[in-house]
């Protein structure tokens, strides 16, 4: 008598974990992750060692201590991480035709997407955590306390990293080639949106509340006490006449809401596009 053995397929959650694990292994094999962490740690060590070596004492305030180290490079680091781990996450499956091996498996496309995004999420959390907690702990050793403002900035940086990754996945799900997705993501976050923020806000007088990079300004503004506020200044120009400049300051509560909105909307749209996208073309 023949015995039929049926094998139960893993649940969606188990498959998400599997995709996440293999995606992280892929980044380890390509040395992207190791390279990012090495660059991050070397930069952090330099930022900690150079000031006292050139005769500049550390700030005595724990918030200023952390801000003096993290504020210059936080958003740049996040943009680099998003470019490396989110921008080509989907498009590379089509460009390299690896989707022919991946997509026929009994795994839902949304499961593949969520597994990949979870790996990027974990990498972003790791990178931002190292970037913040080394100076936070160093500040504890130097000043004797930990600033709650530094913790709040850390939380905002995490949220921005996840939101920027979501935008990167959306771009990756649309673009045909990985190079185009990488270039567009990098310049969108580092140049295009910030320039747009300046034109619309500083010169146009309209607060760019829709902009992810504008709301990311709260990462650094949160260190200031009291928290800064928006203002308008009028400057006389040679030859007569005045020029008005607007300085808009994003509010923390609004920034959190906008970033969460980016995370939800960008991922939902990206999943829909990814599910409908075919290998041909």
Question: Language-model features: where?
Answer:
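Short, charged juxtamembrane terminal tails flanking transmembrane helices
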Residues: 2-5, 273-281
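Hydrophobic alpha-helical segments typical of transmembrane helices
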Residues: 86, 97-98
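Transmembrane helix-loop junction
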Residues: 26, 92, 105, 136-140, ...
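Alpha-helix N-cap/start motif
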Residues: 108-110, 114
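Short helix-to-coil transition segments within interhelical loops
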Residues: 101-108
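Secretory targeting signals
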Residues: 2-10, 38-40, 44-89, 114-185, ...
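Aromatic- and glycine-rich beta-strand/loop motifs that create alpha-glucan
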Residues: 1-38
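Terminal transmembrane helical anchor/hairpin motif
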Residues: 50-65, 190-273, 281
């Amino acid at each position: 008598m023949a015995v039929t053995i049926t094998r139960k397929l893993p649940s969606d959650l188990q498959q998400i974990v599997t995709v996440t694990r293999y995606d992280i292994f892929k980044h380890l094999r390509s040395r992207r992750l190791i390279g990012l962490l090495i660059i991050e740690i070397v930069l952090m060590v330099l930022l900690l060692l150079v000031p006292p070596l050139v005769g500049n004492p550390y700030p005595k305030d724990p918030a200023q201590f952390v801000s003096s180290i993290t504020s210059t490079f936080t958003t740049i680091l996040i943009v680099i991480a998003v470019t490396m781990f989110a921008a080509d996450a989907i498009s590379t499956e089509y460009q390299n035709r690896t989707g022919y091996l991946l997509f026929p498996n009994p795994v839902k496309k949304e499961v593949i997407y969520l597994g990949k995004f979870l790996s990027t999420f974990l990498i972003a959390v790791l990178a931002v955590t190292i970037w913040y907690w080394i100076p936070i702990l160093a500040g504890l050793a130097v000043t004797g306390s930990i600033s709650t403002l530094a913790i709040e900035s850390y939380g905002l940086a995490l949220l921005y990293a996840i939101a920027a990754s979501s935008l990167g996945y959306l771009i990756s799900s649309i673009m045909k080639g990985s190079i185009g997705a990488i270039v567009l993501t990098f310049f969108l976050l580092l140049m295009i949106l910030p320039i747009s923020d300046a034109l619309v806000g500083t010169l146009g007088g309209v607060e760019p509340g829709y902009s992810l990079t504008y709301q990311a300004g709260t990462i650094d503004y949160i260190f200031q006490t009291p928290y800064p506020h928006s203002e308008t200044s009028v400057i006389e120009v040679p030859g007569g006449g005045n020029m008005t400049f607007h300085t808009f300051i994003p509010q923390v509560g609004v920034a959190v809401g906008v970033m969460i909105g980016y995370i939800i909307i960008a991922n939902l749209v990206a999943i829909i596009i990814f599910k409908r996208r075919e290998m041909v073309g």
